[in-house]
């Protein structure tokens, strides 16, 4: 009976350890449910999109770049489920089955991730979208790299609207949705590209 219980415990440790380590109650990674310590997220040119400063996540200084790349990098609270900070949180925190989050505690940050996105192109696409709801995606057809992914509506993480969760007018509808990855858009005439 003891061996069976130990076996179940060991199996659960192996199969669920990442979930336990990434739980929002883990004070090594989260403060009040927000990711506070992780590696940098960079664009293809090395421009920092998100970093850790003084125990909290800091986004790019350029407001237009923050707005344009928010759905791709994600928010620290995890509302944008398809963002890098949520989808790759085990990698940016440096989690491993062998060491857990020890390296995060030892070095003060996790692993950096460099995206194929170009932040300046995303900024131009965001400005071109204006006040329209939609998405812009640019892909290198030879390599499959995503050069630009922009989704609107968006918000500035440094000035999040206070009524975002209580609004009934619909102006924030889909604000946490990355329309490029999760939108229900029918492809147009895709053969023209070829």
Model regions and ranges:
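Short, conserved phosphate/pyrophosphate- and ester-handling motifs at nucleotide-, phospho-/glycolipid
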Residues: 192
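Periplasmic/cell-envelope proteins involved in peptidoglycan metabolism and beta-lactam response
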Residues: 1-166, 170-175, 180, 184-187
């Amino acid at each position: 009976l003891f061996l069976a219980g130990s076996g179940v415990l060991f199996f659960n440790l192996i199969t669920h350890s990442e979930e336990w380590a990434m739980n929002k109650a883990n004070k090594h990674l989260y403060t009040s449910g927000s990711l506070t310590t992780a590696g940098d997220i960079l664009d293809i040119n090395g421009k920092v999109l998100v970093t850790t400063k003084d125990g909290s996540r800091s986004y790019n200084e350029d407001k237009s770049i923050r707005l344009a790349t928010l759905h791709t990098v994600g928010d620290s609270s995890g509302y944008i489920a398809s963002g890098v900070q949520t989808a790759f949180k085990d990698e940016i925190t440096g989690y491993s089955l062998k060491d857990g989050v020890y390296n995060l505690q030892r070095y003060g940050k996790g692993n950096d991730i460099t995206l194929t996105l170009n932040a300046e192109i995303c900024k131009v696409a965001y400005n071109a979208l204006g006040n329209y709801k939609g998405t812009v995606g640019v892909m290198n057809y030879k390599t499959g790299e995503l050069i630009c992914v922009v989704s609107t509506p968006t918000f500035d993480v440094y000035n999040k609207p206070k009524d975002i969760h209580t609004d009934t007018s619909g102006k924030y509808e889909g604000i946490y949705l990355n329309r490029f990855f999760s939108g229900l858009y029918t492809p147009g005439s895709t053969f023209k590209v070829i």
